[in-house]
């Protein structure tokens, strides 16, 4: 039996990661998408034959829908995650989880109350350069660090949607990998 999933937000992380992962996973069935941009949702509907909704609440009532990925800008995460949890869905939310610890705690309380799973997509925990760093540490090649910092970056121009969505300039500079070890 396949897990019936939906994707909320049809931007780059959804179209580049979540949607292809669900489409190609034999254990999942992507059944619904929602984006505040109707055109983005319709494009996914045309490309994959998945029902695109114009209203989030309606999408969350899709028959058989069990779990959703939240792939929207972080300032929307709390409200969307809470609505999805209250509708009985398990949630995989993109990072960062929330704007502050108060919002994160609210989300966790609702997950606990509804007995739904809330998982945050901190995918860098399994990122190959981080595993290599762990290997080097185990072999005592680089010594004992007192702090570790990793940045993800791209080599292209600034991302035009950042200003429009309110995402900080910091995020535009932290995509790609550079690791720093401090002793």
Could you tell me what each predicted segment is?
Residues 106-123, 143-148:
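Rossmann-fold dehydrogenase core element
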Residues 25, 62-63, 127:
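Acidic-histidine catalytic/liganding microenvironments
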Residues 50-110:
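Beta-loop-alpha module in the N-terminal Rossmann-like domain of NAD(P)-dependent dehydrogenases
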Residues 32, 66-67, 147:
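Short, Asp-centered acidic motifs that coordinate Mg2+ and/or phosphate
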Residues 124-183:
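Predominantly a Rossmann-like dinucleotide-binding segment in NAD(P)-dependent oxidoreductases
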């Amino acid at each position: 039996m396949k897990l019936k999933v939906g994707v909320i937000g049809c931007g780059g992380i959804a179209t580049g990661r979540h949607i292809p992962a669900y489409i190609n996973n034999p254990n999942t069935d992507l059944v619904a998408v929602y984006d505040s941009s109707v055109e983005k949702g319709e494009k996914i509907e045309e490309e994959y034959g998945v029902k695109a909704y114009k209203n989030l609440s309606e999408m969350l009532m899709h028959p058989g829908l069990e779990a959703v990925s939240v792939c929207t800008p972080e300032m929307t995460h709390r409200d969307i995650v809470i609505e999805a949890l209250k509708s009985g869905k398990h949630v995989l939310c993109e990072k960062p989880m929330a704007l502050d610890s108060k919002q994160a705690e609210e989300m966790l309380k609702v997950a606990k109350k509804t007995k739904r799973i809330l998982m945050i997509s901190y995918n860098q925990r399994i990122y190959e350069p981080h595993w290599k760093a762990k290997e080097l540490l185990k072999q005592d090649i680089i010594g004992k660090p007192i702090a570790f910092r990793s940045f993800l970056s791209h080599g292209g121009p600034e991302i035009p949607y950042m200003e429009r969505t309110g995402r900080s300039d910091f995020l535009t500079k932290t995509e790609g990998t550079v690791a720093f070890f401090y002793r």
